[in-house]
From Swiss-Prot:
This is Ribosome-binding factor A. It comes from the Bacteria. HAMAP family: RbfA. Transmembrane segments: none annotated. It is found in: Cytoplasm. Belongs to the RbfA family.
Length: 159
């Protein structure tokens, strides 16, 4: 076991090395739109999991996650050697690439929030012209007792 702070530092360094290598040294066109989002290292520093996202070639085009996964799998050996040279640890961790689902989850949450806002707007629009079911003012003020009310003919005091 190793210090968790050291594992976090190594994970951050591995993510930086892999991202730089993908951008500048690996010429695979399948990796052109790959972004490294996170890296986790096991406590024994033997395995590293690299999370990535793939953006579409255009804004409205779907990303090709399968091609990016195949490109990363093919470049795994080169990337591991770059990590070994860049980190200086005794044992170079094995790299595992996992497609990150955070952007998809965030997009789904944004869609749910947009639907909830539309439903709230619809309720607010219906509320604008609504009339109460009973009296217009359900909180009527209580009657104030006056002198005339006290001397009503129904209730007379005996003299």
């Amino acid at each position: 076991m190793v210090d968790p702070a050291r594992a976090r530092k190594l994970a951050k360094r591995i993510g930086t090395i892999v991202a730089t290598a993908i951008d500048h040294e690996i010429k695979d066109p399948r990796l052109a739109f790959v972004t490294i989002t996170d890296t986790k290292v096991t406590n024994d520093l033997h395995d590293a999991t690299v999370y990535y996202t793939v953006m579409g070639e255009k804004v409205d085009s779907a990303p090709d996650v399968e091609a990016a996964a195949a490109g990363l799998e093919k470049a795994k050996g080169v990337l591991r050697s770059k990590v070994g040279a860049g980190t200086g640890v005794r044992f170079t961790p094995t790299l595992t690439f996992v497609a990150d689902t955070v952007p998809d989850t965030a997009r789904h949450m944004e869609e749910l929030l947009a639907r909830a806002k539309a439903a709230d707007d619809e309720v607010a629009k219906a509320r604008e012209n609504a009339q109460p079911a009973g009296d217009a003012d359900p909180y009527k003020e209580p009657r104030v007792a006056s002198d005339e009310d006290e001397a009503s003919p129904d209730v007379r005091e005996a003299d």
